[in-house]
Structure formats: structure tokens, C-alpha cells
């Protein structure tokens, strides 16, 4: 198995509301697809290269993976969105707040020398928005 990830799928409670949240954050999608299949409705966001972020109803993800539906937990993992300045972190965090995200940690100086904050989307998924002065993010 080669070291890579092509697809991250987030289990959500309300596909339409979650899609609208990410669209308000500035992400583009062709909308909900796969509705012709039972348990198939999904939203896909192309992230560049061969990487995608998908939204899939939690109950359908449990069905498809044959894993019992579990309570959601925000601390199982976080998604990182890194930018090239502290100002960009502040801009993204402000947009997340205005879009309905829960700001779990306001942006500020990080213990590791950078600048970051955390928010949770409508389903509690944890996003870190950060700036690392030693890491240039390629757009």
C-alpha cells in the first residue's frame, strides 16, 4: 500500500445543511449526487490532485462499512487547514464563526511557535486552522 490518502469522508447528520455550511465557507461542489442509489447520496469537494473530501450521512456510512453506528466524537481526529499568515487564520476563523461553526479555540499563538485556532462544523468535526512560519503552503 502506497503512502497516500485520496478520499476523506465525513459522516454527517443532515447532508443538505452540511453541504450548505461548506459552500458558505467558500468550497465548491456539484451538489448532492448518488441519490439514484439507496444509501448513496453524497457530496464531493475536489481538493486538488487526486484528493477529495466527501460528506455522507452517518447512518449510510455505518451501513456501507458494516460498522455499527457509534456516537460522534470530536476528538477522534482533526482536519488541518493551513495558510500562509496569521491574518489568513483570523479570516478563516471569522468566516467559520459567521457560517455557524462552534469556535472551540479562538486563534492565537500556538505552543509550537505558530498561530492556530480550532472550530467544529455543524456535525462536530474538528478543524484546525493554522499558520506555521516554517511551512509555505502551496495553493
State what each model feature region is.
Residues 4-14, 43-46, 53, 66-139:
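Vicinal oxygen chelate
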Residues 32, 38-39, 60-67, 105, ...:
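A short, acidic/glycine-rich surface segment
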Amino acid at each position: 500500500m502506497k503512502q497516500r490518502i485520496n478520499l476523506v469522508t465525513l459522516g454527517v447528520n443532515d447532508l443538505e445543511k452540511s453541504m450548505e455550511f461548506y459552500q458558505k465557507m467558500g468550497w465548491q461542489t456539484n451538489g448532492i449526487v448518488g441519490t439514484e442509489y439507496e444509501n448513496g447520496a453524497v457530496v464531493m469537494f475536489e481538493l486538488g490532485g487526486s484528493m477529495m473530501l466527501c460528506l455522507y450521512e452517518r447512518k449510510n456510512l455505518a451501513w456501507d462499512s458494516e460498522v455499527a453506528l457509534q456516537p460522534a466524537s470530536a476528538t477522534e481526529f482533526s482536519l488541518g487547514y493551513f495558510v500562509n499568515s496569521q491574518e489568513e487564520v483570523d479570516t478563516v476563523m471569522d468566516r467559520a464563526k459567521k457560517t455557524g461553526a462552534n469556535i472551540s479555540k479562538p486563534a492565537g499563538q500556538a505552543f509550537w511557535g505558530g498561530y492556530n485556532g480550532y472550530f467544529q462544523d455543524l456535525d462536530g468535526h474538528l478543524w484546525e486552522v493554522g499558520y506555521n512560519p516554517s511551512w509555505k503552503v502551496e495553493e
